Amino acid sequence: MVSRFLIAEYRHLIENPSENFKISVNENNITEWDVILRGPPDTLYEGGLFKAKVAFPPEYPYAPPKLTFTSEMWHPNIYPDGRLCISILHGDNAEEQGMTWSPAQKIDTILLSVISLLNEPNPDSPANVDAAKSYRKYVYKEDLESYPMEVKKTVKKSLDECSPEDIEYFKNAASNVPPIPSDAYEDECEEMEDDTYILTYDDDEEEEDEEMDDE
């Protein structure tokens, strides 16, 4: 079953390429994906092309995938070995999974969540204690140099590790890239058990609909 879901998602992403990430699939194992995430514009991570691996469990989409950075990262919520600490991918037990993971989540939503996390760390739940301490000092203007300097090192190293083809891909895509919303990981509509959605309307739209009905 997992293969059916992944083939559909992969096909959708290939037909609708993103300016913010690039994906490739292990030819021998569709449950293993390689991704490159573009550092969000106007942030310390801008210009970086960070590599990661995504592993999908046999229970997917009823259990979350695991994302591990292979590029060196300096971030409060990324372990030194590349493992990621983000609520959207928590699913170690039924209670936790019910609170944070939904089968309706798609891989593009996950990747946008990770990109958003780069610029919006949660230092209160650190995976890298040293990075979290450095980030706090940066936020409270106690040390404005150390954290940016370490991040910029990872940006440069990520580019050194990328192929010219990958760099060219993102260079061409960066000409008109929309900003990534800070709440990209949040559902834009209410999920239902049958994977259909209830769309919400703005007040102005409701008023227009009422006027049309009166006519």
Swiss-Prot record:
One of its GO terms (cellular component) is host cell cytoplasm. Optimum temperature is 37 degrees Celsius. GO terms for biological process: protein ubiquitination; symbiont-mediated suppression of host NF-kappaB cascade. Changing C85A: Complete loss of thioester bond with ubiquitin. No effect on the NF-kappa-B and iNF inhibitory function. It comes from the Viruses. Keywords: ATP-binding, Early protein, Host cytoplasm, Host nucleus, Host-virus interaction, Inhibition of host NF-kappa-B by virus, Late protein, Nucleotide-binding, Transferase, Ubl conjugation pathway, Virion. Binds Mn2+ ion which is required for highest activity. Can also utilize Mg2+ ions. This is Ubiquitin-conjugating enzyme E2. The gene is UBC.
